[in-house]
Amino acid sequence: MRPTGRLHLGHFFGALANWLKLQQEYDCYFFVADWHALTTHYEDTSSIAENTLQVAMDWLAVGLDPQKSTLFVQSQILEHAELHVLLSMITPLSWLERVPTYKEQIENLKGRDLGTYGFLGYPLLQSADIVMYGEPKQDLLVPVGEDQAPHVELTREIVRAFNFAFGFSVKIPNDIDTRNLIREQLPETDVAPPKTPPLVQQAFDDHLRRDFREAARKAMTEWGYENFREKMGANAKFFTLTSVLQEPAYIPTETPRLPGLDGRRMAKSYGNAIWLTDPPDEIRTKTRNMLTDPQRVRRTDPGRPEICPVFAYHKLFSPPETVVRIDRDCRSAAIGCVDCKKEMAENLVKWIEPIQARRKQFEANPQQVWDILDTGSKQAHKVARKTMKRVRNAIFQWDEARQSSNPARAGKVATGE
């Protein structure tokens, strides 16, 4: 989540409510994405630190538990930037340009200088953020809304390309039957005939290896490794793919409809938000001016709760029996919009009271919040270091090089950590 400052009800129901459930079931990593904030607002960084504190306070106030989840700040884990750079080496520009939100944000943020790699490449940084905390052969799950699903799909493609580039190896078989099978499945490749002289055999093998790598790269990027192995059948025995990075899967996040005060999506830029920190009287004032059913002009006109933003709030903050009554009385014009808003506002105030009470405790001791973020950053750093050691070795083969240059030390590992 970007450090935009205090959070509003849209943040809670759009993300935080789901996070509270996930932390009960999974090892969760939640971070303040301060680097991502630079992709669209690099010209003014003066508020990032304070906004980071405000976001973290709201996280803790709604119930994110540092004993159950790892809470940290993105820029404190430098490995995110390193992995971002390494992923950029194998990611075509066209993959980034086709991300749906790329053109949408350009349209929505007119007037800003968005002609930077930071803006174009932010989905790639997002991919690094995701896969940093994955372990090969273990589920890596990302909770996202429908609009963010393409980002996870992009990450899956990038991981496939990366694993192929640095984890794929081919060993050309010597037996004639397997070579003939390769010829049948890949007729465009050159498979050396029997009794070929060694040097010619090597040339054929090199050519076959190149052809097969390219065909395999395209297939694995499209299908995924396991599906590729299944389709290759018997030929799967002469190649291996080491999963350096784990492909993520996304958990669809179902978010209840919570419009802003004017009926549009709740957003800071629209000025239509109710903040988690709004005092009770401010909540009452804001909700008093909420948009309602535009066809209900007079008090005696029947209403349509299904299109009324106020009723959407009732469904989230009022008791079930109240929701049933409001639905009935609105349709029959037994209750007017003014009274309906008042009742909803009081229920909203009751719902938000414990959140604000917890937040006041953290406001009185902001150092506690920084300490929680620092502790979380240290925990995240341990995982990131492990991931990057695996990544660096896959790309540069540092461990093998050191051991081969000093046979006496092979199999012995010393560390100053």
Describe the residue ranges of each PLM region.
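Short, histidine-centered active-site or binding-site loop motifs used for metal coordination
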Residues: 1-3, 34-36, 136-137, 270
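Conserved aromatic-histidine-acidic binding/catalytic patches
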Residues: 4-7, 43-44, 112, 140-146, ...
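Conserved nucleotide- and phosphate/pyrophosphate-binding catalytic cores
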Residues: 11, 150, 158-417
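Active-site-proximal beta-alpha loop/turn segments in soluble metabolic enzymes
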Residues: 40-41, 136, 265-266
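Classical nucleotidyltransferase
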Residues: 82-85, 94, 100-107, 111-193, ...
